[in-house]
Amino acid sequence: MAAPEVLESDVSSSITLLKNLQEQVMAVTAQIQALTTKVRAGTYSTEKGLSFLEVKDQLLLMYLMDLSHLILDKASGASLQGHPAVLRLVEIRTVLEKLRPLDQKLKYQIDKLVKTAVTGSLSENDPLRFKPHPSNMVSKLSSEDEEESEAEEGQSEASGKKSAKGSAKKYVPPRLVPVHYDETEAEREQKRLEKAKRRALSSSVIRELKEQYSDAPEEIRDARHPHVTRQSQEDQHRVNYEESMMVRLSVSKREKGLRRRASAMSSQLHSLTHFSDISALTGGTAHLDEDQNPVKKRKKLPKKGRKKKGFRRRW
């Protein structure tokens, strides 16, 4: 019962689509005929064209031909099962989809060439206008300088060698211009406050408060000191590298000193009664502890006038 109603509703829409299709076909046909006439007359030179565009046009033309053949068979009531046009349409559609990334890469160059051929010049906002030119890197001598250099070459062999060296100018890059350090005292104080806040958030007091009021399971470590933790991570990385590369790495004197210093810092007992400064989190002014800002030792300079005592040889 519903089939005749569906067919009647499809007839009106099909007639409208066929009229629109006929109008579009007539417009495209007129445009193609005009373009073909210009090409045959030699107005447009197609000898040095892109083979990629030619292949793409041929594929689109074959796709439209098979599609129109398929529409004709479907309109005549023939069965489309096993139709050879369907397989060709699938094959051409697959090739066109594979060509899409290549088309996107060549789109900018093709548009630029077409625009240059039409207008005869590049646009002002073209990014290739701002590319570096190697010719600008070579120092261009004036005609007077060239004449003077030629006159100096004719005087003597020595002067000729000097002028030859002077004529081949080398590119000298410009020196960096010193920039004024315009950081204000307020910005410097803000950076110092942010640094103090980061130090306070990573302090042992805040870490213990988090562990006390947090619902997460307690994390137990062998060594909680940051120096020991960092040293253990470096040792583990060294062991993994040696085991994977089958190579034994040597330890320098500096690394040995750092290990001894880290073990000494972790074994000190003065940190039992030491609490980190968290005044930066409460709105106060953070101050540096003595441990954070140690006093530098002065280097002992050799006194003048003293001579090294030599050893007497005993006979």
UniProtKB/Swiss-Prot annotation:
Keyword Nucleus appears in the UniProt entry: yes
UniProt note on tissues of expression: Expressed in testis, ovary, spleen, kidney, hippocampus and cerebellum (at protein level). Expressed in testis, ovary, spleen, kidney, brain.
Gene Ontology biological process terms, A to Z: regulation of translation; ribosomal small subunit biogenesis
Composition skew (Basic residues), residue ranges: 295-315
Pfam families: Sas10_Utp3
InterPro entries according to UniProt: Sas10/Utp3/C1D
Function: Part of the small subunit (SSU) processome, first precursor of the small eukaryotic ribosomal subunit. During the assembly of the SSU processome in the nucleolus, many ribosome biogenesis factors, an RNA chaperone and ribosomal proteins associate with the nascent pre-rRNA and work in concert to generate RNA folding, modifications, rearrangements and cleavage as well as targeted degradation of pre-ribosomal RNA by the RNA exosome. Its dissociation from the complex determines the transition from state pre-A1 to state pre-A1*.
Keywords tagged on the record: Acetylation, Cell projection, Centromere, Chromosome, Coiled coil, Cytoplasm, Nucleus, Phosphoprotein, Repressor, Translation regulation
Domain of life: Eukaryota
Annotated region (Disordered), positions in chain: 123-190, 212-243, 284-315
Compartments (UniProt record): Nucleus; Nucleus, Nucleolus; Chromosome, Centromere; Cytoplasm
UniProt-annotated stretches for the region Necessary for interaction with EIF4E: 41-174
Compositionally skewed regions (Basic and acidic residues) per UniProt: 180-190, 212-225, 232-241
Subunit text: Interacts with CPEB1 and EIF4E.
Entry coiled-coil feature ranges: 7-41, 181-203
Transmembrane segments: none
GO cellular component: axon; chromosome, centromeric region; dendrite; filopodium; mitochondrion; nucleolus; nucleoplasm; small-subunit processome
Organism expressing this protein natively: Mus musculus (Mouse)
Protein name: Neuroguidin
Residue positions where Phosphoserine is found in the record: S121, S142, S143, S204, S214
Family assignment from sequence similarity: Belongs to the SAS10 family.
Chain positions found as N-acetylalanine: A2
